[in-house]
Curated annotation (Swiss-Prot):
Catalytic activity annotation: [[Fe-S] cluster scaffold protein carrying a second [4Fe-4S](2+) cluster] + N(6)-octanoyl-L-lysyl-[protein] + 2 oxidized [2Fe-2S]-[ferredoxin] + 2 S-adenosyl-L-methionine + 4 H(+) = [[Fe-S] cluster scaffold protein] + N(6)-[(R)-dihydrolipoyl]-L-lysyl-[protein] + 4 Fe(3+) + 2 hydrogen sulfide + 2 5'-deoxyadenosine + 2 L-methionine + 2 reduced [2Fe-2S]-[ferredoxin]
Pathway the protein takes part in: Protein modification; protein lipoylation via endogenous pathway; protein N(6)-(lipoyl)lysine from octanoyl-[acyl-carrier-protein]: step 2/2
Cofactor(s) required, per the database record: [4Fe-4S] cluster
GO cellular component: cytoplasm
GO molecular-function terms, A-Z: 4 iron, 4 sulfur cluster binding; lipoate synthase activity; metal ion binding
SMART domains associated with the record: Elp3
Official protein name in the record: Lipoyl synthase
Keywords: 4Fe-4S, Cytoplasm, Iron, Iron-sulfur, Metal-binding, S-adenosyl-L-methionine, Transferase
Cofactor, free-text remark: Binds 2 [4Fe-4S] clusters per subunit. One cluster is coordinated with 3 cysteines and an exchangeable S-adenosyl-L-methionine.
Ligand binding ([4Fe-4S] cluster 1): C37, C42, C48, S276
InterPro entries: Aldolase_TIM, Elp3/MiaA/NifB-like_rSAM, LIAS_N, Lipoyl_synth, rSAM
Length: 296
C-alpha cells in the first residue's frame, strides 16, 4: 500500500527564493491585500510570484464556510473594506499585470454574497488598467438572489466557479455547498452574457471514481462551461480531509484526453494544476481556441 503521507516526486516544487518573489510579497503586504496563494498554501506560489502573478483574495481573509479541503480561515468574517477595490487596482497597476485573477472567501453573511464588491473591484481595475483582462473566481452565491446578474453586468473576461469535487463527496468535503447550485450559477452567467468565458475546476485524489469525474465533465458541458481545470488534492493540515490517492501524471493525461472529447475550449489537467495557475497564458489560448472554433 502506498504511503500517502509522503508526496510523490511529481508533486514536489522548489522553495521560493527569487528577488521577484519577495518584491511581489512586499507589494501585497504594503497594500494590505490578501491572496489565495498564501491563504490556501498553494504549491505554485514560488513560480507564480516570481513572475509577478498573484491571485488576489477580496472580501476579507475569513470564510463563512468550513470546506474540508480548504486552508482558508473560517469563522466570523471581517468587516467589508470599502477601499479594497482601489488598493487592488493599485496593485494591478504596480505589478503591470496583463491579466489578473480575483477570488474571495465565501460571505454568506452579506445580502448579495459579495457580488457588488466583485463588480466594484472590476470597475476600479478597468479605470486604472483598461488593457488588463480580468478573471474572477467566485463563491457559489447560494441563495443570493440577483448576485449572478450583478456579476454578469460587470463583464469579467472570465467567470470561474469551481465545482471542486464530484457530487457524492459534497456532504463530507464541501458540506455548505450544493453541486447543482454551482452548475446553475455557471449556466446562468453564460445565459446572461454569452461573451463571458466560463471556467470551472475540480480536485481529484479525494476518493472519487473516474466515472464520476467524467460525469462532472458532462454536467459542466451541459452548463456551457468553456474551460475545465483538474488538479491533485493536497491535504493542507492534519485537520483536513486526507488524500485518498495521488493520481499519476499518466492518469491526468487520460482525463485531459477524455475532457477534450467533450467539447471544452480549454482543458488543463495535471498534478499541480490550480484554477489560476498560468491563467494569463491560458486566457490567450482560450481566446485563440474560441476563434478557431468559429471557423472549424
Amino acid at each position: 500500500m502506498a504511503n500517502l503521507n509522503k508526496r510523490p516526486d511529481w508533486i514536489k516544487v522548489k522553495a521560493p527564493n527569487s528577488v521577484e518573489y519577495y518584491n511581489t510579497k512586499d507589494l501585497i503586504k504594503n497594500l494590505r491585500l490578501n491572496t489565495v496563494c498564501e491563504e490556501a498554501a498553494c504549491p505554485n506560489i514560488g513560480e507564480c510570484w516570481s513572475k509577478k502573478h498573484a491571485t488576489m483574495m477580496i472580501l476579507g481573509s475569513v470564510c463563512t464556510r468550513a470546506c474540508r479541503f480548504c486552508n482558508v480561515k473560517t469563522g466570523r468574517p471581517d468587516l467589508l473594506d470599502p477601499h479594497e477595490p482601489q488598493r487592488l487596482a493599485e496593485a494591478v497597476q504596480k505589478l503591470n499585470l496583463k491579466h489578473v485573477v480575483i477570488t474571495s472567501v465565501d460571505r454568506d453573511d452579506l445580502e448579495d454574497g459579495g457580488a457588488l464588491h466583485f463588480a466594484e473591484c472590476i470597475n476600479e481595475i478597468r479605470k486604472s488598467s483598461p488593457n488588463t483582462t480580468v478573471e474572477i473566481l467566485t463563491p457559489d452565491f447560494l441563495r443570493k438572489e440577483g448576485a449572478a446578474e450583478i456579476i454578469a453586468h460587470s463583464k469579467p473576461d472570465v467567470f470561474n466557479h469551481n465545482v471542486e469535487t464530484v457530487p457524492s463527496l459534497y456532504k463530507t468535503i464541501r458540506p455548505g455547498a450544493r453541486y447543482y447550485n454551482s452548475l446553475s450559477l455557471l449556466h446562468s452567467i453564460k445565459k446572461l452574457s454569452s461573451e463571458i468565458f466560463t471556467k470551472s475546476g475540480m480536485m481529484v485524489g479525494l476518493g472519487e471514481k473516474i466515472s464520476e469525474v467524467i460525469q462532472v465533465m458532462d454536467d459542466l458541458r451541459e452548463a456551457k462551461v468553456d474551460f475545465l481545470t483538474i488538479g491533485q488534492y493536497l491535504q493542507p493540515t492534519k485537520d483536513h480531509a486526507e488524500v485518498a490517492k495521488y493520481v499519476t501524471p499518466e492518469e491526468f493525461k487520460y482525463l485531459e484526453r477524455v475532457a477534450r472529447t467533450k467539447g471544452f475550449l480549454m482543458v488543463s489537467a495535471s498534478p499541480l494544476t490550480r484554477s489560476s495557475y498560468h491563467a494569463d497564458e491560458d486566457f490567450q489560448k482560450l481566446k485563440q481556441n474560441y476563434r478557431q472554433s468559429l471557423v472549424s
